[in-house]
Amino acid sequence: MNMSLPADRDTAKKPSAQKPSAHAQNATAAVDVTALGLTESEYTQICSLLKRSPTKSELAIYSVLWSEHCSYKSSRRHLRQLADLTEVTKKHLLVGIGQNAGVVDIGGGWAAAFKIESHNHPSFIEPFQGAATGIGGIVRDIIAMGAKPVALMDSLRFGAASDPDTQRVADGVVSGISFYGNCLGVPNIGGETAFDPVYQGNPLVNVLCVGVMRRENIRLANASGPGNLVVLFGAPTGRDGIGGASVLASDSFTSDAKANRPAVQIGDPFVEKLLTECCLELYAADLVVAIQDLGAAGISCAASELAHNGRVGIRLDLSAVPLRDTTLAPDEILVSESQERMMAIVHPDNLEAFFEITNRWGISGAVIGEVDNSQYLTVVHEGKTLVRLNPKTLTGPSYNRPVKKPAYLIRRSAANRLPVTNDPHLLREDILQVISCPNLSDKSVITNQYDRYVQGNTALCHPDDAGVIRMYKNTGVALSCDGNSRYSYLDPHAGAQLAVAEAYRNVSVVGATPLAVTNCLNFGNPENPEVMWQFRETCRGLSDACKRLEIPITGGNVSFYNQTDGKDIFPTPVVGILGIVDNLTQTLTSGWNAPDLFIYLLGVTRPEFGGSVWADTMYGHIGGVPPKLDLARESRLSNLLVAGAKKRVFESAHDLSEGGLIQAIVESCLRHGFGADIALDTIRATSLTEALFSESASRVLVSCRSQEDLRDLCRRNSYEYTLIGTTRHTGELTISEIGKFTLNELSDARQKVTRVLFRG
């Protein structure tokens, strides 16, 4: 479902010109609407809109399209601020919020479509299929924009690494992502994986996809042309996924939720691969007037969105729908979420050519309706009219839910009161313990399951800070997705801004100019005023950060009801940023690539441990406030990094975020196997603990050959720099105040947890 933001509508509607049959009308007499996910108040509102009782099929449609997942009824009023654009942020934006994905101009007549979405609840119940179909769904969103999918990323959150069920969920999710993505032939170039007890029983599976196309080939989900035909093509419709949007994605559930397995969709990546190539050929032949993928709510959602966006009517005949299960009732056909299906609007003169292409690719299809001037969605089955309603009524209500600042924020204790030390023996133990914690551990056992180089255009991928895909000539598209739920738990407004800043920085450190943002907002129960306060503050933080950085939000996804057994997850905004690389020969990797390089820390280190990995790992402490962020400095840092890459001032660049300086140093050593000699006394810090583990924002670790060039670049951008060491040939990291670590020792420490968890 698109993150469209329709206006809060007047619920007074004219009665339909043609009512459904009496038989169909009476079908809702004994229906328990609450079992369908509707409230009694919402059912009354539906009756008021229709001026009558809904039919069984109409009620099935409303129950899904008025779900939280589809309607954004709790989030819509807060999301409006994300759509605010200035003349500067409009510069590269071609398609914004409201379509299947955002589209930005990347130069040379090319455009990139990108979006991130969630598949959280299904991935707990059936981890493999839940995650796999999450990949399939986001890929079809990109295809529906007219683009060829060229890269994937994922942001994953699992429960405690020590919990027995985490291995089942994590292993299944990663296997599902790798299976579907690898079979589809789309490279997975990066992302993030985190573990925390707050996600026990409610993992987060957020998937980002980017596709490319010529600017003139952008497709929209706007039906037009009365008399044009509605064609359903792809896999036949089955029973899987019925009620997925309302049963799984729009309600809380208990940790024992196996009964919901039928609501999890089943995917076939080989059909999706054929469907992808088929669509691209249909676009090249200009045979599609409009197109919509089938995801949440299936046929009912796709048809209503096409009609609503195009301000036309659509008449469907369910008798013409190709079925995998012939026992499906009409209302089940309407809301089935069977995968690998698309709905296209086709001119009658082009129908023969359309089916010639689908048949060549082995894709089945059928004409199931046509566009008309009625402004209504009409559905018939075996001659009986089952549905007659205005698609505008399907956008759902807009709630102004109460908000309340959480009580835990009043009781939080400051992290800067935790014990710090300058003792070298204690610090050595701290370093090994922190870098081996689940959230900082080596994730290559995950990413090695993904085909990162299929299609042959991957220039950078994990473990670098951003992935880069080769584009026209020698340019590239850079992608990063980031989030820190501990920061958002402590301060949702600041946490959202820090997520934007980190993704922005990660794109910049590879030498790319950030262009646009997509986001996935994962929250608990919206009926909880404290959760709604978190959500409101997060939206405000996203809006403020993007305006300050002059970068547009192109769309995204909201996932509420991430709550199991009454316990809400931490607020978890995940931000994806797309950037453009002017020259791929100037991209930067995250690790030292030679000995005898000078190592510099850019930025200022402060005693900032609120929400840090160090505080959580060493003391089980999550309190205080997140690191302070100055977005003007973040913008200057980005300009400095991009300029330094173009002028070849840097040999490498690595963002500092979770784990602070020591994590960046260790990863930079292990990236290409070069050690380093580090001295911490040049860093202005109150303790060695602060120098090593502080998570102060807007900092980057760089290496260079010419110190004068680096210092001159920093001075011209008014940015702080500190020489902290040099790289070395031997496989050792020496910190003068602490001692030596072998790279094997560091590598083993970082692999302990994930090797066990993912059967590595």
UniProtKB/Swiss-Prot annotation:
It is found in: Cytoplasm. Pathway: Purine metabolism; IMP biosynthesis via de novo pathway; 5-amino-1-(5-phospho-D-ribosyl)imidazole from N(2)-formyl-N(1)-(5-phospho-D-ribosyl)glycinamide: step 1/2. Coiled coil: none annotated. The keyword Transcription regulation does not apply. Gene3D superfamilies: PurM-like C-terminal domain, PurM-like, N-terminal domain. Part of the phosphoribosylformylglycinamidine synthase complex involved in the purines biosynthetic pathway. Catalyzes the ATP-dependent conversion of formylglycinamide ribonucleotide (FGAR) and glutamine to yield formylglycinamidine ribonucleotide (FGAM) and glutamate. The FGAM synthase complex is composed of three subunits. PurQ produces an ammonia molecule by converting glutamine to glutamate. PurL transfers the ammonia molecule to FGAR to form FGAM in an ATP-dependent manner. This is Phosphoribosylformylglycinamidine synthase subunit PurL.
